[in-house]
C-alpha cells in the first residue's frame, strides 16, 4: 500500500505527462483522447479501486502496462511492465552482483591487513585511498574513467555493449564485449562501497585486537595469523554481514545517477523515468520489489549473524 500511495502523491497522472510531451512536439492531444486514455488505463477510477485492482492483477501475474516513452518508441503504452523489466533486470543483477563480489573480495582482506599492520606504510596508503573513495562523487569518477578509457585505451564508453552487440543475440563474443565494458561501471559503483567496508572492517578489528582475550592469547605465543583470523575477525565482520539487508535491493536498483551518466541499460534510469512520468504500474512495482527485497535481506542478515556469531541466539522465554 505504501508503494502505491507514494506513486500517487505527485499532482496529475501519466496521461497529463503525455499531453505535455505531445504539446511540446506540436501535436496537442484532444480532451476526448485524454479521457479515453484514462479510461483505458483505469486512471479515471478512485484511488482505492485502482489499488485493489493493482493488487489483484499482480496476484494473477499481470503487472500492468508501462506508460514510458523512452529511446525511440513511436507511441506510449505499448509495452507491459514485464517486457520493460525483462530488458533490464538481468543486466542490473549481473552488474551489481559482480560489483558486490569484487567489493567484498577486496575490502575484507585490505581491512584486516590495515588493522593488523596499523601505522605501517600500507595502512597509511589504504587509509588515504579509503577516504579518497568516500570523498569522490561516483558520477565524477565515472566521467574521469570514461575519458581515460576513450583517450588512452581507445575503448567505446557508455553502455555495457558496443554498437555491434547492442541488439545482437547472446553469444560468447557478446559476453566478451560485456566483460570489456563492465570494468568502468564496476569500479565506479564499487569504489565508495569498498572504501566504506575497508574502514568498517579496520576499525572493528582494531577494537577486537585491543581486548584482553587477544592480549592474553598473544602473550601465550599464539600464531599471529591464527590469532587474528580465528576469533577477532569473526566478531569484527558482524557489522559487514548486517549490510546484506540493503545488498539485495541494490541488486535491483543499482546507482541511478551513475547509470544515467554512464548510459547503462539497468533498472536505475527506468525507475527514474517511471517516477518522472508517473508510470504508476512500473514505478509502483519496482518500489514494492525493493521493499520486499529489503525485508528478505534483513532476514537473511539476521540468520547469517546467528550462524557466524554463536553469541547471537534468537530464542523465546
Kindly label every feature range from the protein language model.
Residues 31-45, 76, 127-136, 184-190, ...:
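Hydrophobic alpha-helical transmembrane segments
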Residues 28-62, 262-274:
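Short hydrophobic, aromatic-rich alpha-helical segments embedded in or entering the lipid bilayer
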Residues 43-108:
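An internal, D/E-rich "acidic patch" concept
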Residues 32, 46, 50-54, 80, ...:
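Generic alpha-helical secondary structure signal
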Residues 1-49, 153-174:
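Hydrophobic alpha-helical transmembrane segments of membrane transport/permease proteins
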Residues 13, 58-62, 66, 251, ...:
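A short secondary-structure junction motif
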Residues 89-94, 98-122, 138, 154, ...:
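Alpha-helical transmembrane segments of integral membrane proteins
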Residues 2-9, 128-160, 188-194:
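Membrane-water interface segments at the C-terminal ends of transmembrane alpha-helices
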